[in-house]
């Protein structure tokens, strides 16, 4: 196994232990997953598939979702590579990417593959870091993955591109750059942006995530959610974003 993928596998196992020990983290993520589940269109035929499922938590909220990752785990349904999916043409109704988009070195290659497997008007639901003030400061200062805001985004991998050779990649700012800026609008012409929702994510950030210290008692989560609701009205403060794309 590639060393970067092995590191990712080890991180998932560590995260499972943190997940077990931090009830507030489970509750915060449940809120995010409920928002994702609310974007599932029951009129769409085809499978509901999550790519990069990690711990497979999506099944608590979308039980029929097919969970996948780039390596096998006993709690996941199958192994999939976003650049070369094993699903047939137009067999998938929804694709869910939770903290996966910023790991796609060549987003254009992935979107081409997503378009192949999605039914007409099939839906892509993406949940990502956002580059408002809180996102830039917290993720840029305390997170081990780079924001990548100053780096060029390589839309495609070129004529010799192979799905299994993309390698590890991370740039947490890519979703904000691609979906809220002007630079990549022409690259998204085959997709309709149905929704972009920003979250301040304060309850999540102050929970410490998987590795940081929890900065408030779990009993105060409703208070932090109330503050979140107010701050989330201002995308300039956001640390999280939900993007919904429909295939044209």
Predicted regions and their residues:
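Conserved N-terminal segment of class I S-adenosyl-L-methionine
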Residues: 1-83, 241
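Short conserved loop adjoining the S-adenosyl-L-methionine
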Residues: 84-89
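A conserved beta-strand element that flanks and buttresses the S-adenosyl-L-methionine
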Residues: 96
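Short catalytic micro-motifs in class I SAM-dependent methyltransferases
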Residues: 99-100
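A short glycine-rich, Lys/Arg-flanked "PGG" loop and its adjoining helix->strand segment in the class I
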Residues: 108-123
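Conserved class I S-adenosyl-L-methionine
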Residues: 124-162
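Acceptor-substrate binding/catalytic loop of class I
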Residues: 165-183
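A C-terminal cap/extension of S-adenosyl-L-methionine-dependent methyltransferases
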Residues: 182-186, 194-248
């Amino acid at each position: 196994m590639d060393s970067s993928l092995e590191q990712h596998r080890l991180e998932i196992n560590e995260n499972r232990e943190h997940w077990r020990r931090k009830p507030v983290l489970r509750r915060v993520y449940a809120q995010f997953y409920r928002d994702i589940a609310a974007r599932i269109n029951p009129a769409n035929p085809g499978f509901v598939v999550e790519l990069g499922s990690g711990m497979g938590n999506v099944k608590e909220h979308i039980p029929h979702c097919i969970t996948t990752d780039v390596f096998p785990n006993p709690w996941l349904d199958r192994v999939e590579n976003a650049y070369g999916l094993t699903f047939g043409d137009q067999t998938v109704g929804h694709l869910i990417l939770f903290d996966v988009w910023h790991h796609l070195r060549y987003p254009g290659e992935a979107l081409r593959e997503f378009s192949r497997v999605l039914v007409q008007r099939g839906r892509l639901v993406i949940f990502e870091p956002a580059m408002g003030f809180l996102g830039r400061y917290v993720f840029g200062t305390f997170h081990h993955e780079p924001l990548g805001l100053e780096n060029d985004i390589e839309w495609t991998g070129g004529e010799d591109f192979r799905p299994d050779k993309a390698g590890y990649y991370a740039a947490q700012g890519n979703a904000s750059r691609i979906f809220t800026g002007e630079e990549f609008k022409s690259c998204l012409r085959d997709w309709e942006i149905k929704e972009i929702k920003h979250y301040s994510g304060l309850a999540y950030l102050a929970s410490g995530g998987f590795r940081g210290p929890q900065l408030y008692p779990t009993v105060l989560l409703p208070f932090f959610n109330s503050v979140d609701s107010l701050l989330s009205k201002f995308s300039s403060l956001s640390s999280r974003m939900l993007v919904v794309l429909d295939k044209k």
